């Protein structure tokens, strides 16, 4: 997905002031971003119940503004985020009304120094790992 000012889509995006006129009015420019995700799911029948294997991958990148930002900027996420990706494999075992699952999640965000168009360079990665478990009984 390519979008402008797509913070409502949970993308690294927003808008900023690109011109300030003598009468106090302001012109705004949108931040551009690109992102997407991919999810594969496979269900495997067992003698008792079944396994569901899932693999999720997502990516989003800040492409900056088409014009220089000369005033305040309003955006989703930190103003120095360049890109973010997430990988989350999971497995779910279901037997009759009971399900138990586990998901491993690795999320990496590249932070750096924004230029006047809020394109970010000189990045360094920060990674977070999570393990999530689930137990469910349907009745």
Map each language-model feature to its residues.
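Surface-exposed coil/turn segments at beta-strand junctions on protein surfaces, enriched
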Residues: 80, 93, 124-126
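Outer-membrane beta-barrel "beta-signal"
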Residues: 125-139
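Residues on the lipid-exposed face of transmembrane beta-strands in outer-membrane beta-barrel proteins
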Residues: 36-42, 89-93, 102-104, 133-137
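C-terminal beta-signal and adjacent terminal beta-strands/loops
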Residues: 97, 104-117
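Strand-connecting loop/turn motifs
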Residues: 46-52, 93-99, 128
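Short beta-strand segments enriched in hydrophobic/aromatic residues
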Residues: 2-4, 44, 59, 95, ...
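Detector for outer-membrane/organellar transmembrane beta-barrel domains
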Residues: 1-81, 85
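Short proline/glycine-enriched turn/loop segments at secondary-structure junctions
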Residues: 46, 120-124
């Amino acid at each position: 997905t390519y979008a402008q000012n797509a913070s409502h889509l949970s993308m690294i995006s927003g808008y900023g002031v690109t011109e300030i006129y003598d009468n106090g009015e302001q012109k705004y420019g949108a931040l551009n971003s690109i992102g997407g995700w991919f999810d594969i799911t496979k269900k495997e029948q067992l003698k008792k119940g079944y396994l569901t294997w899932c693999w999720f991958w997502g990516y989003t990148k800040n492409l900056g503004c088409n014009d220089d930002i000369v005033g305040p900027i309003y955006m989703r996420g930190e103003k120095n985020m360049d890109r973010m990706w997430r990988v989350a494999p999971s497995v779910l075992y279901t037997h009759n009304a009971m399900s138990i699952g586990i998901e491993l999640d690795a999320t990496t965000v590249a932070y750096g120094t924004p230029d006047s168009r809020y394109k970010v360079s000189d990045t360094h990665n920060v990674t977070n790992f999570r393990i999530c478990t689930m137990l469910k009984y349907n009745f």
